[in-house]
A protein has these predicted regions:
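N-terminal signal peptide c-region/cleavage motif recognized by signal peptidases
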Residues: 16-18
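Residue-level micro-sites within transmembrane alpha helices that shape
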Residues: 3, 179-180
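Bacterial N-terminal signal peptides that target proteins for export
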Residues: 1-7
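A broad, structure-centric signal for solvent-exposed, well-ordered loop/edge residues
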Residues: 7-8, 124
Length: 396
């Protein structure tokens, strides 16, 4: 099944063709699950009011869409991405201006691009500890609670980051998805010789920036290449099949896109295997299934405030990030501009599960939890005493 971008209006799902490249599909899946969880609730009504009618599914991709403004100067007009919500558009422009794509000389203002990730070393036993290697004052683990505090009325909407309550909702809809993508949290580090290292043990090391510098080579692609070489030598016709899924893909893009498609295809097959189900599963059925079936171990630690949840989620996904690297062999590693790049080739694993199948299984689990967690963190943030005491500002 070819999944299309999914949006949700109140309790009714409808489809729209994608207009942007956990790519948009993953983010909108998370947002659509949360939309369904909150539909018909007082919190859902607050979300609709704050977002001027747009859904969390639509809101979930806006933090990536504004990256399209990054080529523009601060004083240049920004393309309209919310033509029917001019106040939201204005607030997003103010947010972009306060957190420019590049740091101005002598400025302490962070860039909004830093808010989407953290670079904790992807090694066994690794934990997110503020101030340690790979963390930043405005990384994703810090920005999620910042948005929570804005929604809860504990952080004024006049803050230096220009994050109003509507913008906080937009950012949460995106960041909660990002923090459930393993390469947005864990980072591989390499020695000058191109070997994977644990940077905490000392010595100079170079990050892979979430896999963006590595081209992923899956087993079927590797076999197809070998078959093609055999054909050229023998003249015989190759029987090897080459998958086009990850051709030319870097490792980060694989997790943003291919793993999501695999995850949703696996979900579709589970639905179709149910005794009473007839025909192909629809996109709406997949979202409804994920929204209605409670994920395993998705709840936060008992009595922990929502401002602590991002760190819990980061620590939960770090082992997955480590495994995402351990299932690959890194070769042809080069160091340039303090960053590592090269090839990442799928290993044959003892469990017999391919990298694509394994990543799809894990991504389905993470998308599922992320959708439920997005709904819960919004509900917890908007229903504190402070948030109830303040009227939401529709325009700043």
């Amino acid at each position: 099944m070819r999944f299309r971008i999914i949006t949700l209006s109140c309790a009714t799902l409808f489809l729209a063709m994608p207009v942007y490249p956990y790519g948009a599909l993953g983010h909108e899946t998370v947002g659509a699950i949360a939309d369904m969880k909150l539909a018909g609730t007082p919190t859902g009504a607050q979300v609709t009011k704050l977002l001027d009618g747009i859904t969390l599914a639509r809101a979930s991709v806006l933090a990536d869409e504004i990256k399209g403004w990054d080529r523009l100067k601060k004083d240049q007009p920004k393309p309209i991405i919310l033509k029917d919500q001019p106040q939201l558009q204005e607030q997003l422009v103010a947010f972009w201006n306060a957190n420019p794509p590049t740091k101005a000389k002598g400025s302490d203002a962070p860039t909004h691009k830093e808010f989407h990730y953290t670079d904790v070393p992807a090694v066994d036993g690794s934990k997110y500890v503020k101030g340690n290697l790979g963390t930043e004052p405005y990384d994703i683990v810090q920005m999620i609670p910042f948005c929570v505090r804005v929604l809860a009325g504990e952080e004024p909407e006049t803050n230096d980051r220009k994050i109003t309550k509507p913008v906080a909702l937009i950012l949460l809809a995106h960041y909660v998805g990002d923090i459930h993508q393993p390469l947005h949290v864990g980072n591989a580090y390499f020695s000058s010789a191109g070997n994977l290292v644990n940077p905490s043990k000392g010595g100079k090391s170079f990050p892979d920036h979430g896999g963006n510098g590595f081209n992923i080579i899956l087993a079927d692609e590797k076999n197809a290449k070998s078959d093609a070489q055999g054909e050229s030598k023998s003249g015989a016709k190759s029987s090897g099949k080459k998958s086009s899924k990850s051709k030319g893909n870097n490792l980060h893009s694989f997790w943003d896109t291919d793993a999501v498609v695999e995850a949703l295809n696996q979900a579709e097959k589970k639905i179709e295997s149910q005794p009473k189900h007839k025909g192909k599963a629809t996109d709406e059925e997949v979202i409804a299934w994920l929204a209605n079936a409670e994920p395993v171990e998705w709840k936060a630690k008992a009595k922990s405030p929502p401002t602590d949840w991002a760190q819990q989620w980061a620590n939960e996904i770090l082992p997955m990030s480590t495994q995402a690297h351990e299932r690959l062999e890194f070769t042809n590693v080069t160091i340039k501009s303090e960053s590592a790049s090269g090839d990442a080739t799928e290993k044959k694993m003892p469990d017999g599960i391919s990298y694509t199948e394994w990543s799809g299984q894990r991504t389905q689990e993470e998308l599922h939890k992320a959708g439920w967690r997005l709904a819960e963190i919004i509900e917890a943030s908007l229903n504190t005493k402070n948030s109830q005491a303040q009227k939401p500002n529709s325009k700043k």
